[in-house]
A protein has these predicted regions:
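Anionic-ligand binding region
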Residues: 94-96
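Hydrophobic alpha-helical transmembrane segments of integral membrane proteins
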Residues: 100-101
Length: 204
């Protein structure tokens, strides 16, 4: 069982970290503990434990690393690529510039797609684990209502994928490249899951 840590922060959020279940930890902020009720906190913890169970931390780290490598290689290709014959070619320069712009964008899109798919999976698995998808949906709405007005201190683009809700405020330009699906979509899926579980007698 991963250890659970409380981080002193004015912004409600949570994340899991660790390369595998044996070396993993889950962290929640003090603001989250104060803002959510018991069922909602259980839903958040179930979501994060699902990330641990499915190895999402390692997958997210690999995706972020690959995006960084692709970006770096595209920059190197611009400055060091091409033979002497093409070094002064305008067409070569145009291709190099296009690669420098498009490669990082493509890498970022791939990273976002991977991260978003893992968030959906963790929501579904977390709802099953807690037996209360509605509580997790309520938690996501509460966390976003706080987080959208304030960027979490210490949050970076390299760690954003780890959090249950994007740690950047709605005014932050980094929000445009969020690694998270829209909260509204996640909530809709969780509501549908809860309805299905109630129909089968499996939801709280």
């Amino acid at each position: 069982m991963p250890k659970v840590y409380i981080i002193d922060s004015p912004v409600p959020n949570a994340f899991a970290t660790g390369r595998n279940p044996e070396h993993a930890a889950v962290a929640v902020t003090t603001a989250l503990a104060n803002a959510l009720d018991k069922d909602e906190i259980e839903g958040v913890l179930a979501h994060e434990l699902s990330h641990v169970k499915h190895g999402d931390i390692l997958i997210g780290t690999i995706a972020a690393s690959m995006a960084g490598i692709i970006t770096t290689l595209s920059h190197w290709g611009m400055f060091f690529g091409g033979g002497d014959r093409d070094r002064n070619s305008s067409s070569s320069a145009i291709v190099g510039l296009a690669m420098m712009i498009l490669a990082p964008l493509a890498a970022g899109i791939i990273q976002m797609a991977v991260s978003r798919s893992r968030e959906y999976m963790a929501d579904k698995s977390g709802g099953e684990l807690s037996g209360n998808p509605d509580a997790l949906a309520d938690a996501l709405l509460k966390i976003e209502s706080y987080a959208k007005n304030r960027t979490m201190p210490g949050a970076t683009e390299n760690t954003a994928h780890m959090f249950i809700i994007c740690p950047f405020s709605a005014k932050d330009m980094k929000q445009l490249f969020s690694t998270h699906p829209s909260t509204a979509d996640r909530v809709a899926r969780l509501r549908a899951q809860a309805k299905a579980m109630r129909s089968s007698g499996g939801a709280k």
